[in-house]
Amino acid sequence: MGDFGMSGDDLEQMYQEVILEAARDPHGREHFATDVSKEQGSAPADTTVRASHEYCTPGESHQFNPTCGDEATVHAEVSDSEPHTIERLVWDGHGCSISQASLSVMVDLCAGKTVDEAMELFRDFHELMESRGAGLQDEAKEEKLEDAVVFQGVSKYPMRIKC
């Protein structure tokens, strides 16, 4: 099952298509105003906010990979009422095609989901990235990951996982 029902060549072709699509039309990418975090009531842009979803507020996470220079800021807004839906999910940044494509796929996958659903997707994606190319061995999880499953190939290269 770890190949999402595809041959290695099919998965590689799908990977290339997802990367190229994200390069042409990166979903959720916005150029942030320098003070967007203050306007939205969240932490400064150079701060990573880490809070469990029980404290639903707008938040940002800024990440920098010093080994390759990838840099991204993700801004999320979550509804105050149950079931705490991700109402807005945008990002800005620069880096390699893998980092840019993964941000674009994340927006497609998580926007509009509940925080609990997004956290489940995060756990499944994290498991995929730790698989060293073997995949999840669970077709239902792979189907939920949609286009994100193409990053299975990246999991073969530990230095690229942070991308």
Regions found by a protein language model. Give the residues of each.
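Catalytic-loop motifs flanking and including active-site residues across diverse enzymes
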Residues: 98-103, 163
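Alpha-helical support elements that line or immediately flank enzyme active sites
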Residues: 102-115
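Alpha-helix initiation and capping sites
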Residues: 13, 17, 66-70, 96, ...
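Basic, gly/Ser/Thr/Pro-rich low-complexity segments located predominantly at protein N termini
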Residues: 74, 98-100, 117
